[in-house]
Amino acid sequence: MAAFTLDLMAQLPEAYQAYAPAVDVLPLIPIFFFLLVFVWQASVGFR
């Protein structure tokens, strides 16, 4: 059982390689929301 678990854990990173481009972009999403606040406030005149 332990050998199977270790083998499964070794294969998981390779299984998720298709998601690598999305994972590279994910940290930028909060920055886009932060910039969106300024765009929103500029559109309403910084009330």
Swiss-Prot record:
Family annotation (InterPro entries): PSII_PsbK (IPR003687), PSII_PsbK_sf (IPR037270)
Any one Gene Ontology BP term: photosynthesis
Keywords assigned by UniProt, alphabetized: Membrane, Photosynthesis, Photosystem II, Reaction center, Thylakoid, Transmembrane, Transmembrane helix
Domain of life: Bacteria
Chief subcellular location: membrane
Propeptide cleavage-removed residue intervals: 1-10
Pfam families, per database record: PsbK
Gene Ontology cellular-component terms listed: photosystem II reaction center; plasma membrane-derived thylakoid membrane
Transmembrane annotation, as ranges: 20-40
Subcellular location: Cellular thylakoid membrane
Keyword check for Transmembrane helix: yes
Entry membrane topology: Single-pass membrane protein
UniProt family annotation: Belongs to the PsbK family.
Function text: One of the components of the core complex of photosystem II (PSII). PSII is a light-driven water:plastoquinone oxidoreductase that uses light energy to abstract electrons from H(2)O, generating O(2) and a proton gradient subsequently used for ATP formation. It consists of a core antenna complex that captures photons, and an electron transfer chain that converts photonic excitation into a charge separation.
Subunit structure: PSII is composed of 1 copy each of membrane proteins PsbA, PsbB, PsbC, PsbD, PsbE, PsbF, PsbH, PsbI, PsbJ, PsbK, PsbL, PsbM, PsbT, PsbX, PsbY, Psb30/Ycf12, peripheral proteins PsbO, CyanoQ (PsbQ), PsbU, PsbV and a large number of cofactors. It forms dimeric complexes.
Name assigned to this protein: Photosystem II reaction center protein K
Organism of this sequence: Prochlorococcus marinus (strain MIT 9313)
